[in-house]
UniProtKB/Swiss-Prot annotation:
Belongs to the intron maturase 2 family. MatK subfamily. It is found in: Plastid, Chloroplast. The gene is matK. GO terms for cellular component: chloroplast. One of its GO terms (molecular function) is RNA binding. The keyword tRNA processing applies. Keywords: Chloroplast, mRNA processing, Plastid, RNA-binding, tRNA processing. It comes from Lupinus cosentinii (West Australian blue lupine). This is Maturase K. Usually encoded in the trnK tRNA gene intron. Probably assists in splicing its own and other chloroplast group II introns.
Length: 508
């Protein structure tokens, strides 16, 4: 068995090095990886209605049909194939989409074997990361800046553009023809990439493919943004669209660097712009600078033209607003953040003269947004839209221990997530709602009133953990740049990675 696994990983590694992916689509072990490894759960078991053995038989039949000529496209109207699709009408596209997702990730993956010493070190540092590392970053960096722009990364992007971009990463023409055919025939592309309120609203069958395509698109756009950041002093806005037309784009970049190195490195004098800070989180980004708003407008135009000419995505200029930090505020990862000016007067005396000196200091405030949180709690049936706690009837059939444990788990998760807030009054209100919801659920189960239930059981000892402060929270750990991203961090491009995010945080 170990020899077979070694052979599988060897074939995958060879395909990655040679950028030849087409044969992997017809390998059964690719779909075995989907089934047997930790890829956000198995698509076979999540769709129910059949056991694992029968689903693996479907995979073998699927591979056989793919090997046969003129059997790639399966029509739902074909009566001979209805029996094959009788388990689940979406099963075929689910299996293939998961297999495609694994194959296209191969040329972009840094290593395949997760048991190496380096990956253990990386995994260890990932466990040290916390959402609380964001706030020292903002206090140390953004509070000293004057202008900030907070906007959403525009999408959807056209399928054909993504396929063309991916061709620069792997030189396998048959695979990309098959990839294009598959996306057009089997995936409902409009549902796959149409913008929603949150990524979590996408169906589970398409989530892995969507996340790969979206992250690949963001990676491509940020790599170009970094090039712009380093060479912006040599680019004029009028020539920007010519440079970023898609035809021979990478050749233009190489030619630009070549010309600059030969002709301009010693003779051209220019004004070097100060740093632009760039932060990406979820589906949004932040641009911040200490300089005048003119520089921020320049970068705003650069990004709009980059999306327009390179990705054929239109972004409304009026949706990207540039605000002063002292006047603007923004939502970040479930928090409401703004910079407040603290003014203080200091008396200074020199000999017989005294002076009053006004000192202005910036302070970052991170507030728990109570209204969106109550809306999320109401949607989860813990309270009504006004924030009044209600019972959770679907949990009333569980034991008392499991009911209390479920509520406490949610409460602890929210406490871990929102303990970085500078004002915790809203957090205490959320915990109060969960506490009363738990009491009402227990009273409903025992067919009693809340008052009688508390008097009989005693509320202080039973539910004291709801208001117990966390003694130790893993926080204030900001991940340093890895060897592959040192250039990004030196260029003021920040990646704030979050290991855990509670579902209730996605308010939008």
């Amino acid at each position: 068995m170990e020899e077979y696994q070694d052979q599988v990983y060897l074939e995958l590694d060879i395909s990655r090095q040679q950028h030849f992916l087409y044969p992997l689509i017809f390998r059964e072990y690719i779909y075995g990886l989907v089934y047997g490894h930790d890829f956000n759960g198995s698509i076979f078991s999540e769709n129910v209605d059949y056991d694992n053995k029968s689903s693996l038989l479907i995979v073998k039949r699927l591979i056989t049909r793919m090997d046969q000529q003129n059997h790639l496209i399966i029509s739902a109207n074909d009566s001979k194939k209805k029996k094959f699709l009788s388990y689940n009408k979406n099963l075929y596209s689910q299996i293939i989409s998961e297999g495609f997702a694994i194959v296209v990730e191969i040329p972009l993956s840094l290593q395949l074997n997760s048991s190496s010493e380096e990956s253990k070190i990386i995994k260890y540092y990932k466990n040290l990361r916390s959402i609380h590392s964001i706030f020292p970053f903002f206090e140390d960096k953004l509070t000293y800046l004057n202008y900030v722009s907070d906007a959403r990364i525009p999408y959807p992007i056209h399928l054909e553009i993504l396929v063309q971009v991916f061709r620069y990463w792997a030189k396998d023409a048959p695979f990309f023809h098959l990839l294009r055919l598959f996306f057009y025939e089997y995936c409902n592309w409009n549902n796959l990439i149409t913008p929603k309120k949150s990524i979590s609203t996408f169906s589970k069958s398409n989530l892995r493919v969507f996340l790969f395509l979206y992250n690949f698109y963001v990676c491509e756009y940020e790599s170009i943004f970094l090039f712009l950041r380093n060479k912006s002093s040599h680019l004029r806005l009028t020539s920007f669209s010519v440079l970023f037309e898609r035809i021979y784009f990478y050749g233009k970049i190489e030619h630009f660097l070549e010309v600059f190195a030969k002709d301009f490195s010693s003779t051209l004098s220019f004004f070097k712009e100060l740093f632009i800070h760039y932060v990406r989180y979820q589906e949004k980004y932040i641009l911040a600078s200490k300089n005048a708003s003119l520089l921020m407008n320049k970068w705003k135009n650069y990004l709009i033209r980059l999306w327009q000419y390179h990705f054929d995505v239109w972004s409304q200029p009026r949706t990207i607003q540039i605000n002063q930090f002292s006047e603007g505020s923004f939502h970040l990862l479930g928090y409401f953040s703004n910079v407040r000016l603290n003014r203080s007067a200091v008396r200074s005396q020199m000999l017989e003269n005294s002076f009053l000196i006004e000192i202005v200091m910036k302070k970052l405030e991170t507030i728990v947004p109570i209204i969106p949180l109550i809306r999320s709690l109401a949607k989860a049936k813990f309270c009504n839209v006004l924030g009044h706690p209600i019972s959770k009837p679907v949990w009333a059939d569980s034991s008392d221990f499991h009911i209390i444990d479920r509520f406490l788990r949610i409460c602890r998760n929210l406490s871990h997530y929102y303990n970085g807030s500078s004002k915790k009054k809203s957090l205490y209100r959320v915990k109060y709602i969960l506490r009363l919801s738990c009491i009402k659920t227990l009273a409903r189960k025992h067919k009693s009133t809340v008052r009688a239930f508390l008097k009989r059981l005693g509320s202080e000892k039973l539910l004291e953990e709801f208001f117990t402060e966390e003694e130790e929270i893993l926080s204030l750990v900001f991940q340093r740049a890895s060897s592959t991203l040192q250039g990004f961090y030196r260029g003021r491009v920040w990646y704030l990675d979050i290991i855990f995010s509670n579902d209730l945080v996605n308010h939008e």
